[in-house]
Curated annotation (Swiss-Prot):
Part of the 30S ribosomal subunit. Keywords: Ribonucleoprotein, Ribosomal protein, RNA-binding, rRNA-binding. Transmembrane segments: none annotated. It holds the Pfam family Ribosomal_S8. One of the primary rRNA binding proteins, it binds directly to 16S rRNA central domain where it helps coordinate assembly of the platform of the 30S subunit. One of its GO terms (molecular function) is rRNA binding. Belongs to the universal ribosomal protein uS8 family. One of its GO terms (cellular component) is ribosome. One of its GO terms (biological process) is translation. This is Small ribosomal subunit protein uS8.
């Protein structure tokens, strides 16, 4: 079976492991984008520490779970968003105002929609977490 979307697979793996009550999860294959999304999730308190393990192939991320993720998913297709449009997409993907984050890939790196709004930059929506 081929893996079509590694980011969506990683986020659903995290969500399912949280629901079962696991304390850690191994995500493979690893990529720079998955690592950046994990960093944003860690900065916002959704996951604990994570580390990259080199297995001689694409690599593996070991992620400590804190039990704070209700749902995490990739946004397909990756919509382009202007700085003024974040509220519209917040209503579409997040369950309530100021609850959860949208992960945005911008020209200045991967960040939350709140950080991008403060900086006044747009980007592409890649994931949501709440």
């Amino acid at each position: 079976m081929t893996l079509l979307d590694p980011l969506a697979n990683a986020l659903s793996h995290i969500t399912n492991s949280e629901k079962v009550g696991k304390s850690e999860v191994y995500i493979k294959p690893a990529s720079k984008l998955i690592g950046e999304v994990l960093r944003v999730m860690q900065e916002n308190g959704y996951i604990g520490e994570f580390e990259f393990i080199d297995d001689g192939r694409a690599g593996i991320y070991r992620v400590q779970l804190l039990g704070k993720v209700n749902k995490a998913g990739a946004i397909k297709p990756r919509f382009s968003v202007k700085a003024k449009e974040y509220e519209k997409w917040e209503k579409r993907f997040l369950p309530a105002f100021e609850f959860g984050i949208l992960v945005v890939s911008t020209s200045q790196g991967v960040m939350t929609h709140k950080e991008a709004l403060e900086k006044g930059i747009g980007g592409r929506l890649i994931a949501y977490v709440y």
